[in-house]
């Protein structure tokens, strides 16, 4: 069935405003608003209902058009001696005539200025009466029309266009800085500030700095993003290390989540405070939070470990240690389970007497300290050499995919 016949069928059953009629055929023709589409369809139906050569007209269609607010149909029927009262739109109850978009925009501006929010992009979310949604679905379903769009989507688009022009900001469906919520029942508005996700890496230049807690990596990160005036800050790390471990090289990946920030300009450069460096700060998204947690174990790490041997070993044993731990699987007890990780390579560098430096290239997600001592780990450095081996210093030289 054609658009015109579908529209005639709809109007004969329900009075519909231009917006709601046009929205039934939203996917049938681009570059035209729903209101313009609905108005054009009514005009075509009006012209088809009149036969100037015979002087006849289709009264049923004209009455349906008049009830739906078509001005020309109302005037024509009145001239024919038939007074038809316009009826409220069955779907929206003439919501588009009642809503004042300019008033809504003014309220949004006032709310943004009141809160002092800095933003570059926005999204609009509207709420409408439940009955409107039900009537919309009822009409589309009964008539078998599959080309429609929701009234909320049209409202969001109309309000969004005016807001974009008025505020000079960009509309974003995927990653907005703020979400503007409009209640069409009472015209109230609210502004929800979305979190900022900041991808970064951190280095720990000195020992004794924990990842979280007081005087930690987390406290430095919170101090840095306090300039954004957030309500709260949540840190997401790609793995953990103890306070005694330095993190060097490229640093450990992290995501800084600043909730409800009033400022959104990210600090740049390398930031050094209290023995912690934050670097490579850039905007991220929620998907990166999931990735940093799920893929932490896939990150490769290079450790520098200074160890003490509690017993004698030969040069041959040390050389064989390097060969043995080349692409070797390590099994490590973790609570009630066991993890299997890969050691890609191990290099032994004698330092002095019983002190050795080990450079370990490994898959992430296991305890390198226990790999040295042998606690819950098979095979281990201590177990392979057959003597007690204890770590003195641990540095993370690099972390990468």
Curated annotation (Swiss-Prot):
Short name of one Pfam family: Pus10_C
Any one GO biological process: tRNA pseudouridine synthesis
GO molecular function: tRNA binding; tRNA pseudouridine(55) synthase activity
EC numbers, comma separated: 5.4.99.25
Residue pairs linked by disulfide bridges in the UniProt entry: none
Catalytic reaction equation(s): uridine(54) in tRNA = pseudouridine(54) in tRNA; uridine(55) in tRNA = pseudouridine(55) in tRNA
Domain THUMP: 64-195
Keyword annotations from UniProtKB, A to Z: Isomerase, RNA-binding, tRNA processing
Family annotation (PANTHER family): TRNA PSEUDOURIDINE SYNTHASE PUS10
Function of the protein: Responsible for synthesis of pseudouridine from uracil-54 and uracil-55 in the psi GC loop of transfer RNAs.
HAMAP family: Pus10_arch
Similarity comment: Belongs to the pseudouridine synthase Pus10 family.
Name of the protein in question: tRNA pseudouridine synthase Pus10
Natural source organism: Caldivirga maquilingensis (strain ATCC 700844 / DSM 13496 / JCM 10307 / IC-167)
